[in-house]
């Protein structure tokens, strides 16, 4: 769970970096205006904005790939946890539990884990009372 939280924090940091824009100065706008021979300052701002879009697209591509990797690892961890819980709870062999988990959809696995951990949290809360 700690690793998932750390990974989620890293993803959020990458998203913030991808969305951040450098401060626009008059000097930069003047250079853009001179390069493109633009008389209007609004056109220079628009062109600079277009130049920034390509950087954002690259960052979004990186963010999307990173998110897919994290999601894949989280799915693998959920599968392993579901197998461990079934072995312990139902008293069956690891191979049988693995076969049951393989037959379940990802949504069913998530629901199974939520039920298990929900009951566990409820038991701990009732013990404290």
UniProtKB/Swiss-Prot annotation:
It holds the Pfam family Latarcin. Cleavage of the propeptide depends on the processing quadruplet motif (XXXR, with at least one of X being E). The keyword Secreted applies. Keywords: Antibiotic, Antimicrobial, Cytolysis, Hemolysis, Secreted, Signal, Toxin. One of its GO terms (cellular component) is extracellular region. Residues 21-60 form a propeptide. Belongs to the cationic peptide 06 (cytoinsectotoxin) family. Insecticidal, cytolytic and antimicrobial peptide. Has insecticidal activity against the flesh fly S.carnaria. Has antibacterial activity against the Gram-negative bacteria E.coli. Forms voltage-dependent, ion-permeable channels in membranes. At high concentration causes cell membrane lysis. Both the N-terminus (61-94) and the C-terminus (99-129) of the mature peptide form alpha-helices which probably disrupt target cell membranes. The linker region (95-98) probably derives from a processing quadruplet motif (PQM), found in propeptides of many zodatoxins, hinting at a fusion of two originally separate membrane-active peptides. This is M-zodatoxin-Lt8f. It comes from Lachesana tarabaevi.
